[in-house]
Amino acid sequence: QMAAEKYNLNIKFINVDESFNLDIDHLKSLLSSKTKIVSIVGESNISGMLPDIKEIVAIVKSKSDALFILDGAQLVPHRSVDVQDLGIDFLCVSGHKMLGPTGIGVVWGRKELWDSMDPVYGGGDMIEEVYYDKATWAPVPHKFEAGTPPFVEAIGLGAAVDYLTNISMNEVQQHSDSLREYAKNKLENIDGLNIIHSLSKNAGCTFAMSIEGAHATDVSLMLDTYGVAVRAGHHCVQPFHRKLNLDATFRATGYIYNDCLLYTSDAADEEDSV
């Protein structure tokens, strides 16, 4: 929105269906020769929705010359991602969602695109030659990394990547999928619990929930007394909550450090009865 305001751009949003999957027909109707960028989430951080990325990339490329940006913050920690196979142009990843430290992430992009772009910030280590009247930039990626880098965070993120690689992302994905099925079966049996999830096998292990008559923050605090960590709020998707007529939800996400969500579901059931 800030870029759109600065450069007089028009932003359009893709609808979702009743199962919270992207409406592909609506996407097709939005594309034109004027479309410059298409950006979608690889996995929804609220409904767990997993779009068919390759299909969507093919549709976008057939109808426009737009660059395709994949938000992989929720996807990359849970599943193996092959950027070459997907055919995307850029991939954005958040470090803290994949066992890394806060304050650091990764933006992968095709090299020819990086080479064609100018630096956003100026500072040390991003220059090649400096003269009184001009400067030349260092090769990618250095020209985009001005100043002292967050080397402590980078080392931490590297260790997290090595850790997950040693486990194998296929193993991580299988564990996440098994947690999803277990959690789905448990949560569906709790009366009064509204589950915002596609409830299909083509989804991640992310469950946003609400209980009628109880605020998400209160539920979160109650679950905390059981030692259960969930997040309460709008999870960076206020328009989505507004569409569902919800002020907030509480969200549980299974990961490699979870063995099951039995305690979480039982605690939510007790909170519902309270």
Locations of the language-model features?
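Single conserved hydrophobic/aromatic residue that forms the stacking wall/gate
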Residues: 263, 270-274
